């Protein structure tokens, strides 16, 4: 029997190459304050998720029209269901123009705050971590949970 392997870090794709770039540091600090992120790893996870989406869209754009047709609609429908795009019929160029804010807006913490269930973004995080928020009747304790469009109206406060 071999030894256990160390699990691969999921945020490495979103981690910047030069982390001490002043402009990048200021931008990250502003995003962390706006969305109530606890550390940069949460931001890097969102960037990695966005990078996967953009990479997939680019690979679809590089295909011929016949190859792309059966793959494009399911991809855009998935993005629509997750709430990253506003319409499943948008062109793929629009998908390429997504930014990290589109991912951060779909986090449970942000949605709880935007719905008015919490007084601040930090209060929303505390409510979620302490188990006072349910999504479709199930308690969710992860503030980074990406809420699909169909479950957005099923978020409730548990007391």
From Swiss-Prot:
A Gene Ontology term for the protein's cellular component: small ribosomal subunit
Signal sequence segment: none
Entries under CDD domains matching the protein: S4
GO BP: ribosomal small subunit biogenesis; translation
Keyword terms, alphabetized: Ribonucleoprotein, Ribosomal protein, RNA-binding, rRNA-binding
InterPro entries for this protein: Ribosomal_uS4, Ribosomal_uS4_arc, Ribosomal_uS4_CS, Ribosomal_uS4_euk/arc, Ribosomal_uS4_N, S4_RNA-bd, S4_RNA-bd_sf
Domain of life of the organism encoding this protein: Archaea
GO MF: rRNA binding; structural constituent of ribosome
Pfam families recorded: S4
Matches recorded under SUPFAM superfamilies: Alpha-L RNA-binding motif (SSF55174)
PANTHER family xrefs: 30S 40S RIBOSOMAL PROTEIN, 40S RIBOSOMAL PROTEIN S9
NCBIfam families, alphabetized: PRK04051.1, uS4_arch
Quaternary structure and partners: Part of the 30S ribosomal subunit. Contacts protein S5. The interaction surface between S4 and S5 is involved in control of translational fidelity.
Record function comment: One of the primary rRNA binding proteins, it binds directly to 16S rRNA where it nucleates assembly of the body of the 30S subunit. With S5 and S12 plays an important role in translational accuracy.
Family assignment from sequence similarity: Belongs to the universal ribosomal protein uS4 family.
Protein name: Small ribosomal subunit protein uS4
Species, as recorded: Pyrobaculum neutrophilum (strain DSM 2338 / JCM 9278 / NBRC 100436 / V24Sta) (Thermoproteus neutrophilus)
Lineage, broadest ranks: Archaea, Thermoproteota, Thermoprotei, Thermoproteales, Thermoproteaceae
Gene coding for it: rps4
